[in-house]
């Protein structure tokens, strides 16, 4: 019964924030902080008290660590079916942690309509948890689309205009909404197609994951349906050429919105590929793998090259996310358990390091009132601790050994090499560009001649706790990743079996 509460807690907390605004602006902040802390605590409790050797695998009914099922619309085979395994648990703990951080980082930034702001923030996170738990495909689609509306309000009502003043927050919010909504509708068509194919085969209408895994279909049908899912996830991940909404949404969103976008919303797409696209359509995925890995490779370089050219610090971090997600895409489609484990580690580590960079850029904006790096410079000696933390997270972002990002990238490259040596070699050279744009960002913002003589105040306790806490966690994951690898091992083994079997069949057919 604990699984529905993981989803309900953020929704109830959001309503309480909205209603609590009449008692002052501070109450909604505390309600939101307690709500997210409770979600994180429940995630940690589940981690401590679960056996994560249970996970779905081919050839048998999926087994789960925890499961909740309640018939909802019997006529169409729709049920409230939630289930937890190692992969979804890691993602829920990441959601809880970044939820706490997004409340903390907006503590002073948001002054207008504080209650409604936190309602939207909590409902985004509730929708994300729903995506990570839902197994019924109708429920999954419901939560997938539900996240978009509060995110739209978050960017449109509390966002900033771009540093050159040309692009407004409404433009960014609308672009985000249209891209993700349109891709979601393509996925809805694919879900309905899959349900109808299964109905023609069995005579039963069902949206249940376990039943749809057994659907028999021709390779052409499988390929078309797989593309429907892939496009929806590719837009959210984002994969080049579906990425153009991301820099605008990041640059114009408030800090909390950027933290949630980079840290959690992009990860729902990678989760969707691992949970739905590969297991439901293994043969089509195996055939599509070279194309997907090539798209990942293009993303690594394209994101890095565009990051070079940015003057807006938040747009630079946004393009670095495009580059990092390219590695995740390569890892997912490699068919190797090492690389799949690496993709999960990269999702966790990139969620933390990108969130940290956005939090620090928000703190920088509060002090300098600009996001344009040409107007910064010479700040290293002016703000205590903030430049040093920025340097650490920039180094983590480029994959410094000893941080979680290194573990993820190393495992992806190590696991992919036997299957696709050329892609691995080219992707490895992409790491060099990662170091260049990370160091360019630090150099432009903190070194060089000072642009103003204004006295800037140092970091307060709240800001220090966020920065140092995230740094400590990234180092912990980098030095001792085993607990996280053990948690996701069974799930990734199942995904690898689906894809590995399909690769073997494909090779023998050729």
Residue ranges and their predicted role:
Residues 1-2, 16-119, 206, 210-211:
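Transmembrane helix-loop-helix hairpins at membrane boundaries of multipass inner-membrane proteins
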Residues 1-9, 84-95, 138-150, 222-233, ...:
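Structural signature of hydrophobic alpha-helical transmembrane segments
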Residues 4-19, 34-46, 92-107, 124-125, ...:
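Central hydrophobic cores of alpha-helical transmembrane segments in multi-pass inner-membrane proteins
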Residues 14-19, 44, 103-104, 126-130, ...:
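Alpha-helical transmembrane segments of multipass membrane proteins
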Residues 50-79, 164-178, 184-243, 273, ...:
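Juxtamembrane/interfacial segments at transmembrane-helix boundaries in multi-pass membrane proteins
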């Amino acid at each position: 019964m604990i699984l529905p509460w993981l989803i309900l807690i953020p929704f109830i907390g959001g309503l309480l924030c909205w209603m609590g605004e009449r008692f002052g602006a501070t109450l909604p902040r505390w309600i939101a902080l307690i709500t997210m802390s409770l979600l994180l605590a429940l995630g940690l409790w589940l981690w401590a008290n679960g056996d994560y050797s249970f996970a779905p695998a081919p050839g048998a009914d999926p087994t789960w660590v925890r499961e909740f099922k309640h018939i909802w619309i019997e006529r169409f085979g729709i049920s409230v079916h939630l289930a937890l395994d190692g992969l979804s648990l890691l993602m829920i703990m990441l959601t809880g942690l970044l939820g706490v951080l997004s409340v903390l980082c907006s503590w002073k930034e948001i002054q207008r309509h504080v209650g409604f702001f936190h309602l939207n923030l909590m409902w985004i996170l509730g929708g994300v948890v729903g995506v990570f738990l839902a197994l019924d495909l109708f429920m999954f689609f419901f939560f997938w689309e539900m996240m978009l509306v509060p995110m739209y309000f978050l960017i449109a009502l509390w966002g900033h205009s771009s540093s050159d003043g040309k692009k407004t927050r409404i433009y960014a919010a609308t672009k985000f909404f249209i891209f993700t909504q349109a891709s979601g509708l393509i996925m809805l068509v694919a879900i309905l197609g899959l349900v109808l194919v299964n109905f023609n085969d069995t005579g039963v209408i069902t949206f249940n994951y376990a039943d749809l895994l057994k659907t028999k279909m021709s390779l052409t049908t499988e390929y078309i349906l797989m593309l429907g899912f892939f496009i929806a996830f590719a837009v959210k991940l984002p994969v080049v050429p579906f990425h153009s909404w991301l820099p605008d949404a990041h640059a114009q969103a408030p800090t909390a919105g950027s933290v949630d976008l980079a840290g959690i919303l992009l990860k729902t797409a990678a989760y969707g590929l691992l949970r739905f696209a590969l297991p439901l359509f293994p043969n089509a995925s195996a055939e599509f793998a070279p194309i997907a890995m090539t798209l990942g490779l293009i993303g690594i370089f394209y994101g890095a090259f565009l990051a070079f050219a940015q003057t807006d610090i938040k747009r630079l971090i946004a393009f670095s996310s495009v580059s990092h997600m390219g590695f995740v895409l390569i890892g997912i489609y490699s068919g190797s358990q090492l690389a799949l484990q690496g993709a999960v580690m990269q999702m966790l580590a990139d969620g933390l390091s990108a969130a940290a960079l956005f939090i620090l850029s928000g703190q920088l904006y509060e002090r300098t009132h600009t996001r344009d790096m040409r107007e910064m410079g010479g700040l290293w000696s002016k703000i205590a601790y903030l430049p040093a933390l920025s340097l650490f997270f920039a180094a983590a972002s480029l994959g410094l050994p000893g941080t979680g990002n290194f573990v993820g990238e190393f495992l992806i490259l190590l696991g992919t090499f036997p299957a696709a040596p050329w892609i691995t070699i080219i992707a490895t050279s992409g790491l060099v560009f990662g170091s260049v744009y990370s160091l360019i960002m630090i150099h432009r913002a903190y070194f060089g001649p000072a642009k103003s003589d204004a006295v800037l105040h140092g970091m307060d306790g709240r800001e220090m706790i966020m920065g140092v806490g995230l740094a400590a966690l990234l180092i912990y994951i980098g030095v001792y990743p085993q607990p996280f690898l053990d948690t996701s091992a069974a799930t990734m083994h199942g995904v690898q079996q689906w894809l590995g079997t399909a690769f073997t069949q494909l090779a023998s057919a050729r």
